[in-house]
């Protein structure tokens, strides 16, 4: 049997991925499938950290444009990621996976407050650690939180799960001739203005040489193939374009 090429990963799941075709909220079947795919990684010996977005429940930036104070909106968005984290923890527990939910700010009685050394300890014990509430500060996206937590826990890679197969030279939804890149370096992404994640998050990953792999979580088995080093999605790292 093939062996994982990564020992420890940070998996970034968007809130939209959890809603499936529902358009809002959480699709239980999607949640359970993701939990089973994560369970498979744990069984392979991979240490898994997870960061969840909250866009399926709330988008602070969108309401800020409509007049809401941006700080208030972002705080509400952070709470949405905690709600998604609670749902993911429950799904993992139902799948017999030991999981711990941590929040960037105190939510006594609901989940633990983020503690770096405790998170490392639990990962080494093969417990899935779910990081919620983003970075704990407004104006930072959950992509920034994913890169930050990935760097802090010394993950081998940040895996960004999306609804597309990877990074294209243009929008595949608008152009049938869009080309999928299999590997890019950080400079390529900036030079060609490719949409991987927001610039603050991407720059953080680049400055700390944190590889990012973008893949389609909707494809059955895609996460497993990524972990085993098979050709899946787009890898962004220090190496040149290929």
Curated annotation (Swiss-Prot):
Reactions catalysed: UMP + ATP = UDP + ADP
An individual GO BP term: UDP biosynthetic process
Known function: Catalyzes the reversible phosphorylation of UMP to UDP.
Activity regulation (record text): Allosterically activated by GTP. Inhibited by UTP.
Enzyme nomenclature, EC number: 2.7.4.22
Natural source organism: Pasteurella multocida (strain Pm70)
GO cellular component: cytosol
Pathway assignment: Pyrimidine metabolism; CTP biosynthesis via de novo pathway; UDP from UMP (UMPK route): step 1/1
UniProt feature coiled coil, ranges: none
Protein name (database record): Uridylate kinase
């Amino acid at each position: 049997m093939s062996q994982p090429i990564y020992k420890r990963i940070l998996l970034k799941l968007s809130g939209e991925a959890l809603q499936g075709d529902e358009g809002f909220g959480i699709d239980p079947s999607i949640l359970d499938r993701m939990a089973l795919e994560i369970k498979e990684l744990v069984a392979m010996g991979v240490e898994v950290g997870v960061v969840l977005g909250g866009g399926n429940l709330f988008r602070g930036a969108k309401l800020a444009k409509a007049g809401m104070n941006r700080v208030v909106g972002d705080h509400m968005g952070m709470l949405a990621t905690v709600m998604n984290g609670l749902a993911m923890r429950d799904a993992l527990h139902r799948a017999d996976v030991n999981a711990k939910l941590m929040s960037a700010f105190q939510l006594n009685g609901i989940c633990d407050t983020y503690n770096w050394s405790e998170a490392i300890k639990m990962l080494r014990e093969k417990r899935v650690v779910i990081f919620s509430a983003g970075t704990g500060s407004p104006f930072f996206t959950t992509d920034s939180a994913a890169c930050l937590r990935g760097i802090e826990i010394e993950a081998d890679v940040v895996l960004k799960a999306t609804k597309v197969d990877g990074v294209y030279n243009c929008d595949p939804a608008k152009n049938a001739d869009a080309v999928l890149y299999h590997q890019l370096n950080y400079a390529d992404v900036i030079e060609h203005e490719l949409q991987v994640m927001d610039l603050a998050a991407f720059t953080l990953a680049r400055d700390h040489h944190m590889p990012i792999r973008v893949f389609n979580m909707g494809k059955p088995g895609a996460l497993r193939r990524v972990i085993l080093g098979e050709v899946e999605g787009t890898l962004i790292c220090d190496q040149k374009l290929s």
